[in-house]
């Protein structure tokens, strides 16, 4: 008798497993879509010296999640920034054609119409808009005319404020490094315990510093409140116009012409012909323009590899004696103490990369950065060319930019040896260029929600059907086994 009962256990277990599985499959659920195709977005970063195009991509059903938007491709527009075409605005639009044609190839044809296309102009256009608003409008109109000829979903060309540029760069860096939220190994969205990191951007016409702070701002214009993924962030940000790489070089050139008649930041043995109109036509150098000014005059200027005089020239760029607040960075601008980790990108990265890779010098501390800068500034033109044969573009300017970066960080932003150790100089994060462009697109396409994304589990339809068949087979197999056991028990030879 006991043997008969034991023989019924396997089919009964199979039947129980099958019935349990069927019951679970019949529990009301929500439909889950199949893995979606990718969606795309395009941002044209119209900087002061050049324009760059970035194509981003993300899964089409993840519009309110994170950690999923990445860079698909990029393209550098040939020629100068769009503000350089003020005298012939049509060329501003024409300059974008090569990169837009690349975008047509990079984005699948069936996604063209649904791909948002943005153009954001930064510090190069801000002063231009103040001095020549009509010319600015003509340039933006010409650019818009070109962009609307393409099958993308063009959503406008606008001039970003300095605050926008700083905040969007901060959002980009922290988004890519998953400092807001990340998908954990437990299969759900979690908020990382690490805090956000500050962002420092050195463009062609301006520089930005942005970081989260607990200190209330004494200047409301430098404080931004953000709500991302259910978390509130108080962010300090400031953009210094005319403190970008290209404008700093122009201002130093104007000072060298006025004070020395030689350039202490240029390497000895390097000389060039300087057209005065090109020096003083910028809004950033108008204040240095001599009264007796002949724009068509050409002046010959030579370098002297003098680190000491170069430092003195750069120090004139910073006014640290006047501060109407309890604490300032420079030029009377309020700034709370820097705190936490920072990422420095754009010209910050390229300059420090030159010091470490080409010059072979360490820059892990402020003191090392100062020493590396001084060594670079004391190099002759022949010595510099020997390090990078065939490269002459920008080679003579690394001393001046490195000197500016050191003084900006130490005297301007007040980094000390301890806080400087928390600064990393980086070009990309998660294979995506760090800059304001991604943060700008994330904001305009609502890809970052204000509240934490919810979690929903589901099963693909094909998997559901397979499980249904499996559990049905289990029940049928159990029934067959039960029938065989019953027949076996009823047979005349059964004990």
Swiss-Prot record:
GO biological process, any: cellular response to interferon-alpha
Binding site for ATP: 204-208
Superkingdom per UniProt: Eukaryota
InterPro entries, alphabetized: GDA1_CD39_NTPase
Family matches, as PANTHER family: ADENOSINE/GUANOSINE DIPHOSPHATASE, ECTONUCLEOSIDE TRIPHOSPHATE DIPHOSPHOHYDROLASE 2
Function: In the nervous system, could hydrolyze ATP and other nucleotides to regulate purinergic neurotransmission. Hydrolyzes ADP only to a marginal extent.
Stated name of the protein: Ectonucleoside triphosphate diphosphohydrolase 2
Species this chain originates from: Rattus norvegicus (Rat)
């Amino acid at each position: 008798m006991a043997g008969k009962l034991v023989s019924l256990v396997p089919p009964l277990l199979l039947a129980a497993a099958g019935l349990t599985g069927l019951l679970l499959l019949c529990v009301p659920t929500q439909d889950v879509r199949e893995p979606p195709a990718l969606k795309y977005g395009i941002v044209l970063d119209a900087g002061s010296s050049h324009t760059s195009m970035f194509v981003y991509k993300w899964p089409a059903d993840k519009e309110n999640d994170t950690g999923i938007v990445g860079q698909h491709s990029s393209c550098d527009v040939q020629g100068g920034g769009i503000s350089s075409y003020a005298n012939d605005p049509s060329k501003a639009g024409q300059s974008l054609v090569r990169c837009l044609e690349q975008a047509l190839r990079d984005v699948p044809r069936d996604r063209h119409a649904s791909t948002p296309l943005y153009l954001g102009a930064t510090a190069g256009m801000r002063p231009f808009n103040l001095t020549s608003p009509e010319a600015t409008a003509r340039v933006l109109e010409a650019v818009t005319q070109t962009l609307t000829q393409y099958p993308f979903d063009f959503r406008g060309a606008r001039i970003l404020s300095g605050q926008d540029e700083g905040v969007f760069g901060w959002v980009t860096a922290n988004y890519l490094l998953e400092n807001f939220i990340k998908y954990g190994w437990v299969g759900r969205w979690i908020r990382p315990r690490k805090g956000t990191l500050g962002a420092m951007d050195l463009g062609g016409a301006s520089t930005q510093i942005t970081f989260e702070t607990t200190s209330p701002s004494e200047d409301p214009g430098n404080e931004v409140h953000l709500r991302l993924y259910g978390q509130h962030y108080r962010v300090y940000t400031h953009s210094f116009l005319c403190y970008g790489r290209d404008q700093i070089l122009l201002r130093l050139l104007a000072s060298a012409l006025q004070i020395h008649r030689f350039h202490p930041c240029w390497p000895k043995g390097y000389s060039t012909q300087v057209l005065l109109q090109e020096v003083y036509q910028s809004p950033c150098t108008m204040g240095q323009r001599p009264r007796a000014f002949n724009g068509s005059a050409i002046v010959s200027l030579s370098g002297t590899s003098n680190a000491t005089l170069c430092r003195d020239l750069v120090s004139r760029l910073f006014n640290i004696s006047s501060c109407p607040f309890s604490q300032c960075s420079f030029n009377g601008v309020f700034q709370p103490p820097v705190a936490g980790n920072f990422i420095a990108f754009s010209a910050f990265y390229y300059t420090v990369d030159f010091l470490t890779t080409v010059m072979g010098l360490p820059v892990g501390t402020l003191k090392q950065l100062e020493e590396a800068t001084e060594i670079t500034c004391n190099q002759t033109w022949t010595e510099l060319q020997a390090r990078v044969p065939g490269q002459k573009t920008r080679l003579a300017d690394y001393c001046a930019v490195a000197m500016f970066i050191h003084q900006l960080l130490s005297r301007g932003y007040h980094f000390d040896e301890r806080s400087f150790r928390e600064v990393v100089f980086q070009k990309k994060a998660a294979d995506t260029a760090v800059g304001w462009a991604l943060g700008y697109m994330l904001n305009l396409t609502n890809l970052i929600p204000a509240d934490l994304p919810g979690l929903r589990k589901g099963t693909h339809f094909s998997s559901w059907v397979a499980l249904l068949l499996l559990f049905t087979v289990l029940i049928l197999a159990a029934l067959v086994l039960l029938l065989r056991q019953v027949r076996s028990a009823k047979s005349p030879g059964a004990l």
